[in-house]
Amino acid sequence: MLKKAVNLALLLAVASTAVSAEELTGTLKKIKDTGVVTIGFRDSSLPFSYLDENQKPVGYAVDICLKVVDELKEKLQVPSLQTKFNPVTSASRIPLIANGTVDMECGSTFNTVERQNQVAFANTYFLTANRFVSKKSSNLNTIADLAGQTVVSTSGTANIQELSMTNVARKLGIKIVAANDHAEAFLMLDTGRASAFVMDDILLASLVAGSRNPSDYSISSEAFSAPQPYAIMIRRGDQQFKGFVNEAT
């Protein structure tokens, strides 16, 4: 009788292990099988995702993702789980998530209805509004003041799309220039090649604070729209991983 009970317990243990293994799908299974989790980061999205003086990815969003990694090590029972950092841009971040190159994008990405057709998002971790920064000497205070001006924004962002729609809707005649990244856009403003830079207000504030002469700049009080949510971006349709990230954060 005792022998039968022991055998039954062993069978149940094996079955339980097998079921647990089968239950891992999508991103969790990929991470478990490869022993690597890949984090997408931005190199100049202060204070959320950027490179420090040692060229190490840091920031608030990166910290959130590293917390997820710690939880992954425990859940998957892989204490030696490796973390690979993969740089992304505004233009490349969605394709790299969608094609599986990156497991989590930890930058400064809006969770929008349009983007939900391609990717998914975890819990909101910050709210920010789309505004513009300009030099105080330009005396640009409202969106209407941008009429006829050269205005830069970053390629592949919701910000430049919103700027374009506002330009058309309000017939402002703005010349819109797309920069490769936030640093390039701010440099265009700093060197006079653009009159204003449209971006998330928190990112603009960080760029101004880190500039040579912060007092030279002014961020508009008027926003292009209501505040929108930042969230960690993950693959679409992977409810298991989404639930895990939400629980971990």
Regions found by a protein language model. Give the residues of each.
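Acidic, polar ligand-binding/catalytic clefts
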Residues: 66, 77-145, 218-223
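Extracytoplasmic small-molecule ligand-binding "clamshell" domains
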Residues: 21-105
